[in-house]
Design a protein with these regions (language model features):
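Asp-based, Mg2+/Mn2+-dependent phosphohydrolase catalytic module
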Residues: 2-40, 49-73, 77-259
């Protein structure tokens, strides 16, 4: 690999990198504190669209992670930015929670089930047959189909949960329409994050625990990529992919001396 510029800004995934099964990853609180005191720009990225940045800040704080709201970038925020760029002041029928609805309201979108420009699907713990049926009919009537992220499952203390990608597949099967996924591994998620902190890809590193989203997304956006072994992907699994991260480390604790 060619020599890269020293890392001046950091993007890091949340689940599996900073927290795991409701607990902080060892070294993660120190890692966040080191990034904050260094003055280097950083963002915590998540494909989870359920929570607002304020909600996530509070949840992370309870685990000893001091992450300010402005340092969180979610697929919900990226979706809001994408829609505002595509069709300013548009309308959307939304299946999702406060993180997504707040992000769309913040960019001036009107949420409606009457002839919306878009059907926007995000994460929720209360998917209803009625809401999914309405989404199918609106898409059949011409609404464009957007989904915050392609993850088919998500983590919980009890085990895997169906995620937005699974519900999107069901809606696609019923309509014959594939959604446009905004979140990771779409490199647009990375580019929007970089723009948010005025960072450049050549001097930014992406830390993640998943080869199929975090590392792929970082590679396609031109970032240095760092795989940690505290989440989904193992060293053995990483070897099976046709692409490789810039490096593999045990956890973010191994990066403390670099910040």
């Amino acid at each position: 690999m060619h020599d890269r510029k020293p890392v001046q800004s950091w993007l890091t995934d949340m689940d599996g990198v900073l927290v795991h099964e409701g607990q902080p990853v060892p070294g993660a609180p120190e890692f966040i504190n080191r990034m904050r005191t260094s003055g280097k720009p950083f963002l915590v990225l998540t494909n989870n669209s359920i929570y607002t940045p304020r909600d996530l800040t509070a949840r992370l704080s309870r685990m000893g992670l001091d992450v300010p709201e402005e340092s969180i970038w979610s697929s919900a925020l990226a979706t809001g930015q994408f829609l505002a760029d595509q069709r300013p002041g548009g309308t959307a029928y939304v299946i999702g929670e406060a993180g997504l609805t707040t992000a769309l309201h913040a960019v001036g979108y009107v949420l409606t089930d009457f002839a919306p420009d878009y059907v926007v699907l995000g994460e929720t713990r209360t998917y209803s047959f009625e809401a999914i049926t309405k989404a199918v009919r609106l898409i059949n009537d011409g609404a464009r189909f957007i989904c915050t992220n392609p993850d088919v499952t998500g983590p919980s203390v009890e085990g895997a949960l169906p995620a937005a990608g699974s519900v999107a597949a069901m809606i696609s099967k019923a309509t014959g329409v594939e959604p446009y996924f905004v979140g990771k591994p779409n490199p647009m998620m990375m580019r929007s994050a970089l723009n948010t902190i005025n960072a450049h890809s050549e001097s930014t590193a992406m830390i993640g625990d998943r080869m199929d989203t975090d590392i792929l997304c970082g590679l396609e956006a031109g970032l240095e990529t760092i795989l940690v072994l505290t989440g989904i992907s193992s060293r053995t699994e990483a070897e099976r992919y046709p692409y490789r991260p810039s490096r593999i480390i045990n956890s973010v604790a191994d990066l403390l001396d670099e910040i």
